[in-house]
Amino acid sequence: DTLFDKRVYFGEWVEYHDMVDNNLPKTAEDYRHGTAVDSIIVDGPRLNPWLDDGCGRFRVRHFGVAIGSKFSSFTITKQIKEIIANNKDIKVWNISLGSNQEINDNFISAEAAVLDKIQYENDIIFVIAGTNKPSTDIVKIGSPADSINSMVVNAVTKNGLSTKYARRGLALSFFAKPDVSYYGGSEEQYIRVCEPLGEANVAGTSFAAPWIARKLSYLIDILGLNKEVAKAMLIDAARDWNEKPTPEEVALYGHGIVPIKMDDIVHTKEDEIKFLVYDISEK
């Protein structure tokens, strides 16, 4: 993400590593986004009681790889590769950065392809923000939100409708990207975060993704599920077995809106039975 300000009230919960070249000038603005995203992962439910998921608080290892709104995706993907190799103990990684340009209908972006390879080789999962609209003429999601192995999250309003800033999939015209949707803040109800100078009300897919990272981390690190099963559990909870969304709805919402409460994800309804079956198919 962008940089992190260690002076905030939850600073002790975050292990911070600044990966940006010291020769580059850093402004106060560069610390806002990264600090806000961390506040959701660490203490989101206290800041937003209506989004209390029952997952508790999380420790964060934060790597500052970008400053301002302009950054080189090549440099960042190279750094991500290095970071993952040196932090094998972390299974869930949140990426709330993305390109303004639209993805291509005919191939996966270079950044997404690299992230897919990293996930496969290291047995980890990325949670990626579905990218925001920089202007009205940009409609499709931007890289790396076309990463197939990642959990891509789009944003909805408190009422469960698509936000003004959300962009749409699909990836390669048939992969459901985004995978799911979650609450990212809007005029009806913004997301409360903690920035370096205090509390702020924000909106964006960047602020929907960390909530899903919390849930994935709970399923993987607390309940001990593997990443494929954890991802499948969230997708399954987002969409009822008898729902049949149109391709347009899938392009905007993915498989649906993930329930707020963790209990609604791990517990089944009275008239349902859920089996978790997983294995690796050998040749």
Where are each of the predicted segments found?
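C-terminal subdomain of the subtilisin-like protease fold in secreted/lumenal serine endopeptidases
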Residues: 221-283
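Predominant activation on well-ordered alpha-helical scaffold segments within soluble catalytic domains
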Residues: 38-42, 112, 116, 181, ...
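Subtilisin-like serine protease catalytic core
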Residues: 2-18, 23-73, 121-123, 147-149, ...
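Flexible loop/turn segments at secondary-structure boundaries
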Residues: 5-7, 69-70, 100-104, 134-137, ...
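Short secondary-structure boundary/capping segments
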Residues: 11-17, 75-79, 109-113, 140-144, ...
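Extracellular S/T/G-rich loop segment that most often corresponds to the catalytic His/Ser-adjacent loop
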Residues: 1-5, 9, 140-217
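Secondary-structure boundary elements
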Residues: 6, 47, 85-90, 117-125, ...
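Substrate-binding/access-modulating region of protease and related hydrolase catalytic domains
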Residues: 65-145, 201-203, 207-208
